[in-house]
Amino acid sequence: ETWPVFKKFKETVAPNHEHWSTIQSVEYVLRYDVTPYMKRIIHTPTLMVTSAYDDITMTEFEVPAFNKLPTPTKRLVQIGGDASHMSLYDNPDHLNLVGSACANWCRDHL
């Protein structure tokens, strides 16, 4: 699902974009554990935006981890409907929802 989106970006807005994944980079992602660092996010406003049907990232692990953050100022935004991980980037309606959520968060917390 990612290749058509990045191919379109390269053809239309980012001609110098190169999108490479290596076996090593995938292995690093799969081994990464954020848990030891979560306790440091105490007084930091934190926003997490996901799609309801994310088929690329592991939201079944990410959302519970987000919920364990000790900061009282956090917000989880899940874009519903038919939103997928990549549609948050290439579907104008989904992108507007993400942009609005992020702009509101920045207005309130920066």
What are these language model-derived features?
Residues 30-33, 50, 55-61:
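Conserved alpha/beta-hydrolase "acid-adjacent" motif
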Residues 41-42, 47-50:
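Short beta-strand/loop motif that positions the catalytic acidic residue
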Residues 1-37, 47:
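Alpha/beta-hydrolase
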Residues 39-42, 68-72:
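Short, conserved loop/helix-junction motifs that constitute active-site signature segments
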Residues 60-64, 93:
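Generic recognition of short, well-ordered alpha-helical segments
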Residues 69-86:
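Catalytic histidine neighborhood in serine/cysteine hydrolases
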Residues 101-109:
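C-terminal alpha-helix
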Residues 82-96:
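Catalytic histidine-centered segment of alpha/beta-hydrolase-like enzymes
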